[in-house]
Structures are given as C-alpha cells and as structure tokens.
Regions:
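Active-site rim/loop-helix segments in enzyme catalytic domains that contact anionic ligands
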Residues: 1-68, 195
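Metal-dependent de-N-acetylase/amidase catalytic core
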Residues: 18, 35, 52-196
C-alpha cells in the first residue's frame, strides 16, 4: 500500500456534531486510515455539498498531483445523487490535464492516468471494466474501514456490509477471493492485438 494518498475535498456534517467537530473527526479518521495503509491523507477546505467545480479547485488539485507524482489517480465516477462526487469526477480530470500539460506554478508537470472507483452513490452508468484482485490486502482494507465512523455507524446505509460483500462478489466474478472494480473513460476502452 505504499504511495497511497487519498485527497478528501470535503467533510460531512452529521446531525449530532457541528461542522467543525465533524471536520476534526474526519481528519483524524483519514489519518488513522492512512496510517494503516502507510500513506498520507490530505483534506481540502470544502464542506459537504459545497465543493465548487471551478478553476481554483482544479489548480489546487493539479498542484497536489505535481507535488506527489502519483503513478495513477483513483477518483469518483460521475454521480446521479451526490453533487460533490459529481464535481470531483470533473475536477480531477481537469486537474490531471492541468498537471500533465500545463504544470504547476513553477511549470513542473506530471501525468498519471485516471481510474474511477465503484461507489454505490455513483453507480449510474458505472461499468465495472477493470477487476483488481485485493485478496492479499483485504484484511488490512477491512480493518482500515473500521476507522471510518460513518462506514461503521450509518443508520441510513450499511456501508461496511455493502463494500465487503461487493468485494467478495467482484472476487467471485473474476475468479479471485476478493476484488474491486474500476472504470475508465470510454475512449480508453480498447484493446490492440496483433491477432485474435
């Protein structure tokens, strides 16, 4: 799990906590999750439902891409129900372009391909195109999920059960014990072979 850098653009606000209290909790949860994954967590300043899809955010994310030089970028598929996920989908693609073609403030560039993760809130038109075997890391990932309050305590959706069960189902479909699925943009969905 070396080199994992989740970048949370927003923080949510459940009824029993103030926005500021939950922001602190989410930052601590992100750190706990990434400590287990041997990574670093970044959380930007935007509140739940308030992530703007604008040039300022795109440039901020592009700066992060250039600074950390990821091998690949995983982000949200476009969403039919979550405004922030939908904005993130487009922000990251534009930030990838800025980072790879224009570069940061110093003109330094970095390109990394973008993959879209499977998420129940973003499943409209999601095509599980790439199956990745996560069997070796499943126990660690499962343990890391326990650091996320909403995953373990939501009264609205059984996140933990859903994602661990989905990993098993995707594993069965791919001949593995556990797997996670990713999508790519349509123009990346091609195979080039010398013969069939």
């Amino acid at each position: 799990a070396d080199g994992i850098l989740p970048c949370g653009f927003i923080y949510s606000n459940p009824a029993h906590l103030s926005v500021l209290e939950y922001r602190r909790q989410k930052i601590n949860e992100a750190k706990a999750y990434m400590d287990l994954m041997n990574g670093e967590a970044l959380v930007l300043k935007y509140a739940d439902g308030e992530l703007p899809n604008n040039d300022e955010v795109k440039k901020e994310v592009a700066e992060i891409i250039v600074k950390y030089k990821p091998d690949l970028i995983v982000t949200h598929w476009h969403s039919s129900m979550h405004k922030d996920h939908n904005n993130t989908h487009y922000i990251v693609q534009d930030a990838q372009f800025i980072a790879g073609v224009i570069g940061n403030k110093e003109g330094i560039r970095h390109y990394a391909p973008v993959y879209f993760c499977e998420n129940w809130e973003d499943d409209n038109d999601f095509d599980p195109y790439i199956y990745v075997d996560i069997t070796k890391g499943f126990d660690l990932w499962s343990k890391a999920l326990h650091t996320q309050w909403f995953v373990m305590n939501s009264k609205d959706f059984a996140y933990y059960d859903y994602y661990t069960s989905l990993a098993r189902c995707r594993g069965a479909l791919s001949g593995k014990r556990y797997a996670q699925c990713f999508n790519v943009l349509k123009h990346h969905k091609k195979e080039v072979k010398d013969e069939l």
